[in-house]
């Protein structure tokens, strides 16, 4: 059984027990979080697709920790113009473990 849900403008495909990185949610480690925006649930041959969300479906997860990703550096240089731009970005994330997929 797997589910597809939406969080922070992105879609994630998860199974029970999987560990994923979500956008930062400012929660304490070991706390529980409920993800309600479930787009689809697939259980063997049975597929349940929501319009836009599956009614009564939710995903229960546990927060493992919060952190920051590796730095991504973008560099632009315009030749012969002595013009350059360097920017760095680090993503803040919350690492969660999927405990249970509930479909009614």
Swiss-Prot record:
Q: Does the keyword rRNA-binding apply?
A: yes
MF annotations from Gene Ontology: rRNA binding; structural constituent of ribosome
Which portions of this protein are annotated as coiled-coil regions? none
Q: Which InterPro entries match?
A: bL21-like, bL21-like_sf, Ribosomal_bL21, Ribosomal_bL21_CS
- A GO cellular component entry from the record: ribonucleoprotein complex
Q: Can you tell which superkingdom this protein's organism belongs to?
A: Bacteria
Keywords assigned by UniProt, alphabetized: Ribonucleoprotein, Ribosomal protein, RNA-binding, rRNA-binding
Query: Could you confirm whether the keyword Ribosomal protein appears in this record?
Result: yes
User: Example GO biological process term?
Assistant: translation
Q: Which family does it belong to?
A: Belongs to the bacterial ribosomal protein bL21 family.
Q: What does this protein do?
A: This protein binds to 23S rRNA in the presence of protein L20.
Which HAMAP family is this protein grouped with? Ribosomal_bL21
Q: Enumerate the NCBIfam families for this protein.
A: L21
Report the PANTHER family cross-referenced here: 50S RIBOSOMAL PROTEIN L21 (PTHR21349), LARGE RIBOSOMAL SUBUNIT PROTEIN BL21M (PTHR21349:SF0)
Subunit structure and binding partners: Part of the 50S ribosomal subunit. Contacts protein L20.
Query: What name does UniProt use for this protein?
Result: Large ribosomal subunit protein bL21
Organism equals Helicobacter hepaticus (strain ATCC 51449 / 3B1)
**What is the gene called?**
rplU
């Amino acid at each position: 059984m797997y589910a597809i849900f939406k969080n922070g403008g992105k879609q994630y495909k998860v199974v029970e027990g999987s560990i994923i990185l979500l956008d930062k949610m400012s929660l304490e480690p070991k706390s529980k979080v409920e993800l309600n925006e479930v787009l689809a649930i697939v259980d063997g041959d049975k597929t349940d697709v929501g319009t836009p969300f599956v009614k009564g479906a939710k995903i229960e997860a546990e927060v493992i920790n919060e952190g920051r990703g590796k730095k991504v550096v973008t560099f632009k240089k315009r030749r012969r113009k002595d013009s350059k731009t360097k920017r760095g970005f680090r993503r803040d994330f919350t690492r969660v473990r999927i405990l249970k997929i509930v479909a009614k």
